[in-house]
Amino acid sequence: MLKVPEHQVAGHIASDGKLGPLVDDQGRFFKPLQGDSRGEHEAKFYESFTSNMKVPDHIHRYFPVYHGTQLVEASDGSGKLPHLVLDDVVSGYANPSVMDVKIGSRTWYPDVSEEYFKKCIKKDRQTTTVSLGFRVSGFKIFDHQESSFWRAEKKLVLGYNADGARLALRKFVSSNSPADSNLTPNCAFASEVYGGCNGILAQLLELKDWFETQTLYHFNSCSILMIYENESILMQGGDDAPAPRAQVKLVDFAHVLDGNGVIDHNFLGGLCSFIKFIKDILQSVEKHDETDTSLLENGR
């Protein structure tokens, strides 16, 4: 039985009779091929990437596993349509917090139509795409105090400036109520989610190492998904704790082009900028912890 993804935070959402992705109960994600060339283009990318022996094994884990295409009943009731069949990257989580971040200082690319170029450049300038090299596209957080999800409003997210993006990244790893805009995010989960040898930062740095040399593809208008489960941190790895914790995935490949032997500076530059934001948050948390420790020691 196919259903609308519960944890999708950006992109085309299959609701109110609209065409969008679906998921099943077996951990598969069905993404409809868009009617123009973009859907076919994305399928060809997955086929190329999956079989490309030049892509290191450790890099493949940052991409959804591709299972080909399949005709399934479309979410808009238009009948059977071809869909990409991918691993549902959040299927292993009970209550995942998810953030979608579009990487790159531009989302358009050479030889696009004038209409598409104008659409992209307008949105790129209105968001932090041009100024920061990335933009937060959407996110949701599991509020363990309320045992429910809080989702950032799309209009608010698209209006973020640099401070707004920084605040969102801090809120994403905080334990205090995400719904209360008057609260300063406490970044209670930052060290466990962003930090550590297997945390978000370590994964982003591994991707960065590859992007500094790879010339196979140019990842235009692609996103990074960050996923984690705060309950597993709160339960401190007990027997009943959900797993895994933090994960990075790259998604949305309808606009990927051949690299033709040239480094993808657009994606790499945006990735480096995003990494700096994550590093800054971790450093501020470490500094705060050191201050608290010093105050405790002096108060003995």
Swiss-Prot record:
It is found in: Nucleus. The modification Phosphoserine is found at residue 78. Coiled coil: none annotated. Expressed in leaves, stems, roots, siliques and flowers. Detected in vascular strands, stigma cells, the abscission zones of fully elongated siliques, the root central cylinder and the root tip. GO terms for molecular function: ATP binding; inositol tetrakisphosphate kinase activity; inositol trisphosphate kinase activity; inositol-1,2,3,4,6-pentakisphosphate 5-kinase activity; inositol-1,3,4,6-tetrakisphosphate 5-kinase activity; inositol-1,3,4-trisphosphate 6-kinase activity; inositol-1,4,5,6-tetrakisphosphate 3-kinase activity; inositol-1,4,5-trisphosphate 6-kinase activity. It is an enzyme of class 2 (transferase). Pfam families: IPK. Disruption phenotype: Loss-of-function mutant atIpk2beta-1 (T-DNA insertion) is fully complemented by AtIPK2alpha in tissue but not in seeds, leading to the generation of phytate-free seeds. Increased sensitivity to 6% glucose during seedling development and decreased germination in response to the gibberellin biosynthesis inhibitor paclobutrazol (PAC). Keywords: ATP-binding, Kinase, Nucleotide-binding, Nucleus, Phosphoprotein, Transferase. It catalyses: 1D-myo-inositol 1,4,5-trisphosphate + 2 ATP = 1D-myo-inositol 1,3,4,5,6-pentakisphosphate + 2 ADP + 2 H(+); 1D-myo-inositol 1,3,4,6-tetrakisphosphate + ATP = 1D-myo-inositol 1,3,4,5,6-pentakisphosphate + ADP + H(+). One of its GO terms (cellular component) is nucleus. Induction: Induced by auxin, but not by salt, abscisic acid, mannitol, water or drought. GO terms for biological process: embryo development ending in seed dormancy; myo-inositol hexakisphosphate biosynthetic process; pollen development; pollen tube guidance; regulation of DNA-templated transcription; response to glucose. Disulfide bonds: none annotated. Its EC number is 2.7.1.140, 2.7.1.151. It comes from the Eukaryota. Belongs to the inositol phosphokinase (IPK) family. Inositol phosphate kinase with a broad substrate specificity. Interacts with KIN10 and KIN11. This is Inositol polyphosphate multikinase beta. It comes from Arabidopsis thaliana (Mouse-ear cress).
